[in-house]
Amino acid sequence: TYNNADDSGLHFTVEALVNGSARSCDVVLTEKNAPDNSEALTVNINITQKPKGLIECVADMRRSRCYFPFLKNGGALNSLKNGTMEALVNIQETRVSGSLSTIMGVEGKFLLRLGDVNVPWNQIQLAMQGGNRTDTKLKLSELDRWYHVAVTWDDTFAYFYIDGELLYRTGISNYSGFNLGVAYGGSESDYNRAFWIGYAYNADRFFPGYMAEVRVWNRTLTKEEINAENHFYSVPVDSEGLVGYWKLNDGAGHIIKDHSPSGNSMLGEINVHSSGGQQIGDPGMNWVEMSLP
């Protein structure tokens, strides 16, 4: 309901939403004292009111990364003979052919990313010690669009999902299980070669957009579980098999809380770049207010 206008602006009264449903209205402003022989100016404004989202903040991962300063419970991320990695991602800018963009994982061991030499820059790839896995059906074709991506695996196959649709299955050699909770040899950073979000090997392999709801499980989620109501946007923190859960919704500072029982919180860095053979950055994270779904 319109109330009045003064030098500070227009004033409306808005009632609470009923049953959480969204609503909107159009407001037309018309100039009252138009100059002689001039048509009055009009401005159309659309006002939308909707319930609070399950997600209210995300991380802009461009030239940014998340890492473990130490692992409170590294064992929870090891020996993953069965498992799932999943995240919400939103590409904000295109990259040149041959670019690599990291979602999460360990360089040279088990890494979920986009692109590669001879792989389109926006195509999902699982880079493994025993060889890389990808398929032309795994492209994230639209900019500024949220996608839920998930890779699940057992001791025989890896399964690739986009927005809950199983698009590709491929054989893998899992051996005794993948270890995401240890550091490996590698001189590309002060923190060694380990599990990162949004980074691997060098500063140019950042994710070119927003990320949220990054999760690691020690079991192979089913298609039905991935497509459960609101699973893309939130899961109970005590869910069976949830061993890593970084919502990337912290909103301030650079501590990235692990909401899973493992308690392996991360730190964020921005302005990541190469200097003297090291890949370094500044403490921080670029937070973006955004309501999802």
Task: Describe the predicted segments one by one.
Residues 1-13, 122-123:
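Surface-exposed binding patches on compact interaction domains or structured appendages
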Residues 52-64, 75, 171, 228-293:
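Extracytoplasmic low-complexity segments
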Residues 54-125, 157-158, 201, 219-226:
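Extracellular glycan-recognition modules
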Residues 83-93, 204-232, 243-252:
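Extracellular, beta-strand-rich glycan-interacting domains
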Residues 124-148:
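Short, aromatic/His-centered strand-loop micro-motif at the edge of beta-sheets
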Residues 129-130, 183-212, 227-235, 293:
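Extracellular glycan-interaction patches encoded by glycine-rich segments
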Residues 145-159, 219:
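Localized edge beta-strand/strand-to-loop motifs within extracellular or lumenal beta-rich domains
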Residues 163-192:
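Short, solvent-exposed beta-strand-to-loop segments that form ligand-recognition rims
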